[in-house]
């Protein structure tokens, strides 16, 4: 009896435990927890406020927990990032790019707009009577997603919606005709530059970068466009429109460029374009009409205080020292004109140069045009000995003995290294060195012509071997005076005393010591006019040959205004 009673007791306890062990319904996990559940590591639901926060009395502060940013989004402000709710809403779009309307709004809408927006349209009977036909009634069987843009939290959602639907002609036809205010609001350029724009970028960071560029264009040109309208492929892109012709007061301007101009403005734009086709802009042929044509002073655009240098219409070369002299005379003789020009804008210069076919014309060892000419005509080495003798004679004639001692100390620094490198060279090596020099000079000639920087090239003895046209305009020295036939000009003849001493010190430092062979310094250039000296910033680049011996120095100069 005891055994049977124990079996009955065990069976009863097993049945009771089976009833109590029924699996509890699992909570459905949500893709994003609220801030309180996330902090407590608890399971959350998709509702806001969630059930757990309602039970704990935290429903007023229940919101989505912030997610950890990606590295490429560390510097992006929070206001520009796309919210998670808008990202999820864009995934729920149907095939036509339409999403159901949000059930609640974060802030109340204006009464007029609220009365004109139905909250739900389950069938055709709720369509207003002013719908034009049954076809449009059938298309209005969904709630317009445009109403969701009244909530600040859903602005990005509206932009994402139009990302899929802006180019769809079917959906464009389904826009409710009884929402004219909303239609104009979303399909015309907005007056608010901070309003989110529709975009073709799937990456928020890429869209943010492009939106920033669009905002810059809006601020500078007064033309409010969306991110799609700012692309070169859009219909609103009009390179013929200048920023001055664009409207700035009309915030609801039409999107096409033909509607931005009146008939008179269109004719003016057409005539301006035709004018620019036949008249190539140049320093001597500009659209400005206020050119100061006084014969006493150089040609100048007084609206921007800009003087013209180089070749002129009369065939006369205007050089920088002459302009400086004229400005000084204007300052002394016509102070009113001088003050008027400088009060408008800072002093500036523009240069017009016509490059000759032979940049070193007239000299026996002129610049070769082709590399084949170099290897055919260079049959003997270049003699540096006469150059050194002429350099020493010039230095003794110009400088005092204390300065000559300092120059000699600088030369003594690199003289032993130079003797050691050249002691073992044969005549064929010296011929090859000269071929390398001419070949390098031919390559640099192409660079110097297109750089526009005043440039001069000299040998290691200081003898000038090449002069750019811009350097002649800067200093006023004629090219025939520097590298003409039977002329030997040294770089030290173009520098003042302090700059010459600095030159030898710099050359001794970079000749064999500095492998890069480039340095930047400041020097003063002499001009044919003894009363005019030009303070410049310069960069000297030393070029070595295959034997490691200094071959040439390239000097670039820019005036310090």
From Swiss-Prot:
Biased composition (Polar residues): 97-151, 222-239
GO terms under biological process: cellular response to starvation; gluconeogenesis
Pfam family, one: Zn_clus
Keyword Transferase: no
Comp. bias intervals (Low complexity): 7-18, 78-96, 245-258
Chain ranges of the PAS domain: 440-514
Signal peptide limits: none
One annotated GO molecular function: RNA polymerase II transcription regulatory region sequence-specific DNA binding
GO CC list: nucleus
Keywords on record: Activator, DNA-binding, Gluconeogenesis, Metal-binding, Nucleus, Transcription, Transcription regulation, Zinc
Keyword Metal-binding: yes
Primary subcellular site in the record, as a coarse category: nucleus
Subcellular location(s) of the protein: Nucleus
Region (Disordered), start-end ranges: 1-32, 61-151, 222-258
DNA-binding region: 34-62
UniProt xrefs under InterPro entries: ERT1_acuK_gluconeogen_tf, PAS, PAS-like_dom_sf, PAS_13, Zn2-C6_fun-type_DNA-bd_sf, Zn2Cys6_DnaBD
Function according to Swiss-Prot or TrEMBL: Transcription factor which regulates nonfermentable carbon utilization. Activator of gluconeogenetic genes.
Protein family per UniProt: Belongs to the ERT1/acuK family.
Protein name from the UniProt record: Transcription activator of gluconeogenesis ERT1
């Amino acid at each position: 009896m005891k055994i049977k009673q124990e079996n009955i007791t065990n069976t009863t306890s097993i049945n009771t435990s089976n009833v109590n062990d029924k699996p509890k319904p699992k909570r459905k996990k949500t893709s994003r927890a609220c801030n309180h559940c996330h902090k407590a590591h608890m399971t959350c639901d998709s509702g806001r406020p969630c059930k757990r926060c309602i039970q704990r009395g935290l429903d007023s502060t229940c919101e989505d927990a912030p997610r950890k940013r990606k590295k490429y989004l560390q510097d992006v402000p929070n206001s520009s990032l796309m919210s998670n709710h808008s990202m999820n809403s864009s995934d729920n779009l149907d095939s036509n790019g339409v999403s159901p309307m949000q059930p609640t709004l974060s802030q109340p809408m204006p009464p007029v707009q609220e009365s004109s927006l139905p909250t739900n349209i389950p069938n055709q009977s709720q369509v207003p009577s002013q719908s034009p036909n049954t076809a449009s009634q059938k298309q209005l069987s969904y709630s317009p997603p445009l109403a969701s843009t009244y909530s600040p939290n859903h602005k990005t959602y509206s932009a994402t919606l139009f990302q899929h639907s802006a180019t769809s002609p079917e959906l464009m036809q389904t826009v409710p005709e009884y929402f004219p205010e909303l239609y104009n609001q979303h399909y015309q350029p907005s007056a608010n530059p901070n309003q989110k724009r529709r975009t073709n970028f799937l990456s928020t960071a890429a869209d943010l970068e492009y939106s920033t560029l669009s905002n810059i264009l809006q601020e500078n040109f007064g033309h409010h466009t969306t991110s799609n309208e700012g692309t070169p492929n859009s219909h609103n892109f009009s390179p013929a429109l200048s920023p001055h012709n664009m409207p700035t007061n009309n915030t609801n301007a039409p999107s096409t460029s033909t509607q931005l101009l009146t008939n008179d403005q269109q004719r003016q734009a057409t005539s301006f374009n035709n004018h620019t086709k036949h008249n190539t802009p140049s320093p001597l042929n500009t659209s400005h009409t206020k050119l100061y044509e006084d014969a006493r002073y150089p040609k100048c655009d007084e609206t921007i205080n800009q003087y013209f240098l180089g070749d002129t219409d009369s065939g006369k070369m205007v050089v920088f020292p002459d302009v400086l002299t004229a400005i000084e005379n204007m300052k002394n003789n016509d102070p009113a004109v001088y003050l008027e020009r400088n009060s408008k804008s800072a002093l500036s210069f523009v240069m017009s140069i016509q490059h000759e076919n032979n940049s070193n014309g007239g000299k026996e060892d002129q610049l070769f045009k082709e590399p084949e000419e170099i290897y055919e005509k260079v049959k003997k080495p270049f003699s540096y000995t006469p150059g050194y003798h002429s350099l020493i004679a010039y230095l003794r004639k110009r400088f005092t003995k204390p300065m000559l001692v300092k120059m000699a100390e600088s030369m003594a620094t690199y003289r032993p290294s130079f003797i050691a490198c050249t002691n073992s060279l044969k005549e064929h090596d010296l011929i090859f060195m000269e071929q390398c020099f001419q070949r390098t000079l031919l390559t640099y000639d192409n660079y110097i012509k297109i750089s526009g920087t005043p440039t001069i090239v000299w040998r290691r003895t200081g003898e000038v071997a090449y002069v750019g046209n811009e350097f002649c305009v800067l200093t006023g020295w004629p090219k025939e005076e520097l590298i003409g036939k039977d002329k030997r000009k040294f770089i030290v003849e173009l520098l003042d005393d302090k700059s010459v001493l600095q030159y030898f010190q710099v050359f001794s430092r970079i000749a064999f010591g500095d492998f890069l062979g480039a340095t930047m310094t400041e020097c003063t250039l002499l001009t044919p006019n003894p009363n005019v000296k030009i303070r410049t910033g310069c960069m000297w680049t030393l070029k070595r040959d295959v034997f490691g011996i200094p071959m040439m120095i390239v000097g670039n100069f820019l005036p310090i205004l």
